[in-house]
Curated annotation (Swiss-Prot):
Its cofactor is Zn(2+). Its EC number is 3.2.1.-. It comes from Staphylococcus aureus (strain MRSA252). This is Protein-ADP-ribose hydrolase. Binds 1 Zn(2+) ion per subunit.
């Protein structure tokens, strides 16, 4: 295969490869802009089943994703702690963090979001890491013989992300308010399972997304309180030296986490 030197050419190759795989013989006029090409590629990658993939495809995908991802990297050492020297609150794109592990809010099927171009964290992490993550997750599910339970944690490589690893956890889904004690405990269990797994793997740092607060509808204020309380208790009780980043995306979540730490200091 001729070496593809531009990310635009790589996108076109990957799109054509996935269309061939789907037996899609319709005439396609390739979009002219990189953004439109990316959206087409991402949508196809999102809905692609966890099937074997060629070495050629992986080589092109990895060259493109690693190049795109290294253009936007946030190093943990550039962040300022909010408490002590090991707890951080940071607003930004978790997929840009150069860190030992980021946490993905997965669903029970555990294959990543399969809705084309959906803007949930599960979709974005899988898209930017590469198809290998879906294949790894599928193998985890195959070996355990059932869907992933709420509150557990599993680890995969980060592949093309700046993060070395991805820790996947399934949070509770809220269908009615107020949130039950069971669902509060299950959310806390998500954080505990991720922390324990990180320590078992001898990781130095971990970044949490806001688990269950998206389509799973856990109230953001309650979720922030549970996250902060659970992490602080774990670090204190275990004497863990893990550095923990609470990653937020919205201004509202940033404010809620700051308020949670302010209340904790009172």
């Amino acid at each position: 295969m001729e070496t593809l030197k531009s990310n635009k050419a790589r996108l076109e190759y990957l799109i054509n490869d996935m269309r061939r795989e789907r037996n899609d013989n319709d005439v396609l006029v390739m979009p002219s802009s990189f953004e439109d090409l990316w959206e087409l590629y991402r949508g196809l990658a999102n809905v692609r089943p966890a099937l074997p993939v060629s070495d050629e495809y992986l080589a092109v995908q990895d060259a493109m994703l690693s190049d795109l991802n290294r253009q936007h990297v946030t190093d943990l050492k550039d962040l300022k702690p909010i408490k002590g020297d090991n707890i951080f609150v940071w607003q930004g794109d978790i997929t840009t963090l150069k860190i030992d592990a980021i946490v993905n809010a997965a669903n029970s099927r555990f294959l990543g979001c399969m809705q084309a171009n959906h803007d949930c964290i599960d979709n974005i992490i899988h898209t930017k890491a590469g198809v290998q993550v879906r294949l790894d997750c599928a193998e985890i599910i195959r070996q355990q013989g059932r869907n992933e339970g709420v509150g557990k944690a599993k680890i995969t490589r980060g592949y093309n992300l700046p993060a070395k690893y991805i820790i996947h956890t399934v949070g509770p889904q809220i269908r009615r308010l107020p949130v039950s004690k069971l669902n509060q405990d299950l959310l806390a269990k998500c954080y505990l399972s991720c922390l324990k797994l990180a320590d078992q793997q001898s990781l130095n740092h971990i970044a949490f997304c806001c688990i269950s607060t998206g389509v799973f509808a856990f109230p953001q204020d309650e979720a922030a309180e549970i996250a902060v309380r659970t992490v602080e208790s774990y670090l204190k009780e275990t004497n863990s030296t893990l550095k923990v980043v609470f990653n937020v995306f919205t201004d509202k979540d940033l404010q809620l986490y700051k308020e949670a730490f302010n209340r904790d200091a009172e």
